[in-house]
C-alpha cells in the first residue's frame, strides 16, 4: 500500500498592512513563513493608509514568493496548490495578493484556492494542534469580533458579531488618545497588567440573550473620561485607564463566549485574530473554561503569538481543508473586500 502523498500549498496574504507568503505541508506544518511588515510606514498616520499599503505589497510580493520557496527548499513542481486571501480586507491590498496568486497559477498550471481571511485566522489553531469538531472560535481583530461555530473544517457559522466597532479597532482608537503608537494592543495589554480597574467602564450587551458585541459605547466613555480630565487639568493614571478599558472588553468577550460554549458544547475552543495575542484575554478564557464541569470543558487551542497577526501560514492551513474538499477557484477569482462567513459549503461530511 503506497504512502499518502504530502500536500504542499504556497499561500499569499495581503488583506491589510502585512505582505506574507508561506509554504504549508499537509495543513499542519510550516515549512516557510515570510512576513514583510509595514507598521513603521503607517505609524505616523495613526493607522493603515490603504494606498500606502497597496504600494508596499507591490514592492515586495515577488521577492517574498521566492523567499518562501527557498526557505522551504521547494521548487514549483513540489507545490500542489496556490492559496490566496481574497477577502475581507482593503480592496487595493487584496488585489495585489490575488493578482500574484492568479499569475503564478496561470504560469505554472498549479490549482488556485481562494481563502476567506477570517477562516484563515481561525485555522491558525490547526498549525498548533488538531481541531476536534464541532468547535467554537472567538475571532477578535481590528476589523472583526465574532463567535463562530465550526461544524467541520470548511463549514463555519457566525453566531455572534459586533454591531459597530471591533475590539481591536477600539484598542487602537483609545491608544491614540493615550499617545500610544499604532498598533496599540500590545502596549495597552502591558499597561493593563500594571493598573487596576478603577473607572468602571460600561460592559455593553453583557446580559443580552444573543452573542453580539458592541464596543462603540465603551470607546466613547473612555474618550469622554480622558477629555473631561483634560478640561479640569486632572492627570489620570494611564495604567488604571488601560486596566479599566481592557477589563470591560474582556468581561464581555469571556462572558458571551463561555455562554456559547455551554449552549453548543464544542469539542474544541479556538481563539484567532490579532487580539488573540492579548495575554489578559488568553489567561481569562483559559481560567473560565477551567471552571466548567470537567465533562463540559472543550480542548483549548490558542495559536502561537506570531500566528495571531496577519500571515500566510494560516491561509495555507485553511486552504488545505478546502483542497481536501475539492474547493478550487478559477482565474476569474477577484478580491471581495466585504466577504463574509459562511461562504464555503461543507464537502467533508
UniProtKB/Swiss-Prot annotation:
GO terms for cellular component: cytoplasm. The gene is tsaD. One of its GO terms (biological process) is tRNA threonylcarbamoyladenosine modification. This is tRNA N6-adenosine threonylcarbamoyltransferase. Binds 1 Fe(2+) ion per subunit. It is found in: Cytoplasm. Belongs to the KAE1 / TsaD family. Its EC number is 2.3.1.234. Required for the formation of a threonylcarbamoyl group on adenosine at position 37 (t(6)A37) in tRNAs that read codons beginning with adenine. Is involved in the transfer of the threonylcarbamoyl moiety of threonylcarbamoyl-AMP (TC-AMP) to the N6 group of A37, together with TsaE and TsaB. TsaD likely plays a direct catalytic role in this reaction. It comes from the Bacteria. InterPro entries: ATPase_NBD, Gcp-like_dom, KAE1/TsaD, TsaD. Its cofactor is Fe(2+).
Amino acid at each position: 500500500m503506497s504512502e499518502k502523498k504530502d500536500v504542499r500549498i504556497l499561500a499569499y496574504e495581503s488583506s491589510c498592512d502585512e505582505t506574507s507568503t508561506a509554504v504549508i505541508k499537509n495543513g499542519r506544518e510550516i515549512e516557510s513563513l515570510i512576513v514583510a511588515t509595514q507598521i513603521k510606514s503607517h505609524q505616523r498616520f495613526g493607522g493603515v493608509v490603504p494606498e500606502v499599503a497597496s504600494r508596499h505589497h507591490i514592492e515586495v510580493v515577488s521577492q517574498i514568493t521566492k523567499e518562501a520557496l527557498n526557505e522551504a527548499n521547494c521548487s514549483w513542481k513540489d507545490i500542489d496548490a496556490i492559496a490566496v486571501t481574497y477577502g475581507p480586507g482593503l480592496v487595493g491590498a487584496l488585489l495585489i495578493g490575488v493578482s500574484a496568486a492568479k499569475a503564478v497559477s496561470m504560469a505554472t498550471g498549479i490549482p488556485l484556492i481562494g481563502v476567506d481571511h477570517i477562516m484563515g485566522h481561525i485555522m491558525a489553531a490547526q498549525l498548533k494542534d488538531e481541531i476536534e469538531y464541532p468547535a467554537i472560535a472567538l475571532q477578535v481583530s481590528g476589523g472583526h469580533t465574532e463567535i463562530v461555530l465550526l461544524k467541520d473544517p470548511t463549514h463555519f457559522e457566525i453566531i455572534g458579531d459586533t454591531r459597530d466597532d471591533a475590539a481591536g479597532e477600539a484598542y487602537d482608537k483609545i491608544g491614540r488618545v493615550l499617545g500610544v503608537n499604532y498598533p496599540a494592543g500590545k502596549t495597552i495589554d502591558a499597561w493593563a497588567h500594571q493598573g487596576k480597574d478603577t473607572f468602571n467602564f460600561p460592559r455593553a450587551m453583557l446580559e443580552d440573550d444573543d452573542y453580539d458585541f458592541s464596543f462603540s459605547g465603551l470607546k466613547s466613555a473612555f474618550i469622554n473620561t480622558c477629555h473631561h480630565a483634560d478640561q479640569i487639568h486632572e492627570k489620570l493614571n494611564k495604567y488604571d485607564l488601560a486596566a479599566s478599558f481592557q477589563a470591560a472588553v474582556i468581561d464581555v468577550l469571556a462572558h458571551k463566549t463561555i455562554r456559547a460554549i455551554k449552549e453548543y458544547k464544542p469539542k474544541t475552543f479556538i481563539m484567532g485574530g490579532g487580539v488573540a495575542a492579548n495575554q489578559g484575554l488568553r489567561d481569562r478564557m483559559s481560567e473560565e473554561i477551567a471552571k466548567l464541569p470537567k465533562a463540559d470543558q472543550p480542548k483549548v487551542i490558542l495559536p502561537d503569538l506570531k500566528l495571531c497577526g496577519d500571515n500566510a501560514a494560516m491561509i495555507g492551513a485553511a486552504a488545505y481543508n478546502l483542497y481536501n474538499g475539492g474547493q478550487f477557484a478559477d482565474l476569474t477569482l477577484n478580491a471581495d473586500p466585504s466577504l463574509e462567513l459562511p461562504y464555503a459549503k461543507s464537502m467533508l461530511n
